[in-house]
């Protein structure tokens, strides 16, 4: 049974639900997307903004909230890009995590990202895809960028 305000795994409820987004824009004829990064001893690790669904939220509400909290960008959802489900072990517990992603456009940049990340960058699409694939290949977020490109075509 789950007793948290979030859809976060527990020892007895091994499921985790998250949502996030790909914030995109066209600058000087180039498609750009937002990526977050954390500085690690072996270099920067890039990923897309996302976070855990709260019980009183829709997936869309979660995506908008997490994108704003993590990137500092208030964004509007333009479409659904699908989800990934991942099974893994954490602290000896088998977990199932599903993360939903949305295509989003920026409305306002507050300039305040969360303390969990070292930075937020707008990158040209191909560069962002390459960085997502090379720094966090197991997360497969580069595939979400491919879905964004298909969505926009």
Model-based region annotation:
Residues 1-28:
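Acidic, metal-coordinating catalytic segment for phosphate/diphosphate chemistry
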Residues 68, 72-109:
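Active-site segment of metal-dependent pyrophosphate-handling enzymes
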Residues 29-30, 109-112:
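Short helix-loop capping/hinge motifs at secondary-structure junctions, enriched
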Residues 43-46, 111-153:
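Nudix hydrolase/Nudix homology domain
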Residues 30-73:
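Conserved Nudix-box catalytic region and its N-terminal flanking loop in Nudix hydrolases
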Residues 23, 37, 101-105, 124:
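Short, well-ordered beta-strand micro-motif
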């Amino acid at each position: 049974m789950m007793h948290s305000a979030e859809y976060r795994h527990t020892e007895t409820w091994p499921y985790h639900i998250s949502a996030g987004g790909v914030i995109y824009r066209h600058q000087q004829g180039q498609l750009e997307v937002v990526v977050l990064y954390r500085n690690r001893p072996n270099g920067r690790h890039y990923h897309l903004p996302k976070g855990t669904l709260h019980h009183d939220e829709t997936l869309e509400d979660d995506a908008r909230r997490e994108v704003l909290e993590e990137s500092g960008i208030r964004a509007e959802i333009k479409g659904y890009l699908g989800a990934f489900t991942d099974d893994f072990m954490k602290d000896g517990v088998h977990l199932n995590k599903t993360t939903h992603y949305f295509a989003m456009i920026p409305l306002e940049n507050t300039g305040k990202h969360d303390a969990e990340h070292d930075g937020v960058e707008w990158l040209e699409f191909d560069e962002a895809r390459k960085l997502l694939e090379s720094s966090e290949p197991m997360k497969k977020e580069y595939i979400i960028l491919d879905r964004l490109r298909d969505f926009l075509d």
